[in-house]
Amino acid sequence: EDASDRTISMEKYGDTPVKRLSKFGLLNRKSILAHCIHLDEEDRKIIADSGAAVVYNFDSNLNNQVGLPQLAKLPQSVPVLCGTDGMNAKPHSTFRNLFLFGRHQGMSFGDAIALVKKSYFDQITFARHYFHDFPTLQQGSRADLIVWDYIPPTPFDQNTFWGHYLYGVLERNIHTVIQNGNLLMDHSRIQFPQDIYFNSIAVQGARLKQSFEKES
C-alpha cells in the first residue's frame, strides 16, 4: 500500500513484494493482492501471468495518504475486486469510487463503466474459486437474494442499469434478504432475534480493543 513497503523490500531483499511472492510460489488464481499502488510493468506482468486477483481499497489509501493505484495500467486479464480494508462495511461504495477514480485518471465514461462491470463479474468468478456452489439467478440454483427498495425515476434497462446501480440502487435500503430460501429480512425488518448477536458483537469488540491496547 505504501511506497515504503516497496522500498524496504528492495533494500532488504533486492526484489519488489510482488516478485518475492512469485519467487516463493505464493501467487496463483486463489491469491489476493491488496492495494497494488506501487507496481512496475514487470510486477503487473507477473500478476497477470499468475492469475492472482487485485483488490482495491480506496478509502484506506486516502486515509493513509499513500496515493491511488493506476487503474488503466493493470492488464485486462487481472481480476479486479473491490474491498474496504476494514474502513467500512460497504464494499459496494468502492464500486462507485472505482468509476469516479477511473474518470479522475482520464478514462472515458464508457471505459470507467466497463471497469466497474468487469470488477462486478470478476468478483463472482473469483468467489467460485473458493465457493464452488456460489449461486446464480438460474432455475435450480440456491436462493440467495437481496432486493433493494428502489423505484427508478428514469428509464431502467440493460443500457442504463449501471448508472442506476451506482447512483440509485446502492443509495437505497435493503428491502428483502433471502439466504438458502430462508427469509432473513422482509420490508427492511430482520426476521429473527438479534439481541444474542449484538451482545456477542459487543463482547468481541471489547476483547479486540483490549488486545490492541496490550500490543501498543
Predicted regions: what they are:
Residues N63-P69, K90-T94, D157:
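Short, charged, surface-exposed secondary-structure boundary motifs
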Residues K23-L26, A72-P152:
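His/Asp/Glu-enriched, well-ordered alpha-helical/loop segment
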Residues I47-D59, V203-S211:
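Short, electropositive alpha-helical surface patch
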Residues E1, F58-N63, D85-N88:
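Short, acidic/turn-prone active-site loops that include or flank metal/cofactor-
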Residues K117-S216:
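Active-site microenvironment of metallo-dependent hydrolases
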Residues H35, Y56-N57, C82, W148:
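Conserved beta-strand positions
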Residues E1-A53, N64-V80, H132:
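Histidine/acidic residue-rich metal-binding segments in metalloenzymes
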Residues L33, I47, V54, D85, ...:
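Divalent metal-coordination and catalytic microenvironments
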